[in-house]
């Protein structure tokens, strides 16, 4: 053993430059291996974090005149991969104790209406999530909200409304009251043309909790449902 050790030492002394090159190659190879392992680990961690943060989702929308029913929702919930559902409804109603925001006036009954969007969670899958709209007062509608209403700042100003005030809506055969829990503004509301009629103006978009939508519609019907799932590959 000592013989081979002595020979190795003598070789290193005689071939210094070659030995240094071999050592450098060894170091570089090991650094590359460590780097690749680190990149692979970080990539896997990043993919896991992205999947957790974004929460894969499927969007189901009404087709033609067929709305999404409560029965459809129950069927969706039966899938074990479903972790959350955000139901979205749309209807139109007449203000009963306030006036809508006036745009270009047309001799049409719908020009006196407001647009109501019902949400389970307004912080997701909405114009608030896309940052087109932002809350300037109060709080957004969530799963626990009841009789909750969020209105536009200009609509509030034109009717001298504020947080806590009651609004009444009426449809063909229903009247429902709710409480203002939030006031919002839109980044594009001032870009609307002056010729835009009241019916289409952003100021007349009102967000409500789902219990208000159900009463106005006489039943649970939805125009869109966003289904959050744990693993898309396991959906059947």
At which residue positions do the language-model features occur?
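N-terminal Sec/SRP start-transfer signal
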Residues: 1-34
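Alpha-helical transmembrane segments
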Residues: 18-20, 28-56
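Conserved beta-strand edge residues that scaffold enzyme active sites
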Residues: 26, 90-91
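Basic-flanked hydrophobic alpha-helices used for secretion and membrane insertion
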Residues: 49-58, 64-84, 91-236
């Amino acid at each position: 053993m000592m013989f081979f050790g002595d020979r190795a030492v003598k070789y290193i002394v005689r071939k210094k430059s070659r030995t240094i090159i071999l050592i450098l190659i060894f170091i570089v190879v090991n650094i590359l291996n460590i780097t690749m392992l680190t990149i692979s680990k970080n990539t896997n961690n990043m993919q896991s974090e992205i999947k957790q943060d974004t929460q894969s989702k499927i969007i189901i929308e009404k087709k033609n005149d067929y709305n999404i029913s409560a029965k459809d929702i129950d069927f969706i919930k039966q899938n074990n991969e479903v972790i959350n559902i955000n139901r979205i409804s749309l209807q139109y109603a007449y203000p009963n104790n306030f006036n809508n925001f006036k745009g270009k006036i047309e001799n049409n009954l719908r020009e006196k209406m407001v647009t109501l969007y019902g949400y389970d969670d307004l912080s997701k899958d909405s114009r608030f999530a896309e940052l087109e709209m932002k809350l300037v007062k109060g709080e957004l509608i969530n799963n626990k909200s009841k009789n909750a209403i969020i209105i536009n700042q200009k609509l509030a100003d034109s009717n001298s409304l504020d947080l806590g005030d009651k609004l009444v809506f009426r449809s063909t055969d229903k009247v429902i009251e709710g409480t203002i829990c939030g006031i919002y503004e839109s980044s594009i509301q001032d870009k609307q043309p002056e010729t835009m009629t009241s019916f289409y103006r952003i100021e007349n978009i009102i967000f409500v909790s789902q219990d208000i939508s159900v009463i106005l519609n006489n039943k649970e019907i939805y125009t869109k449902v966003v289904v959050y799932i744990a693993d898309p590959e396991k959906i059947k």
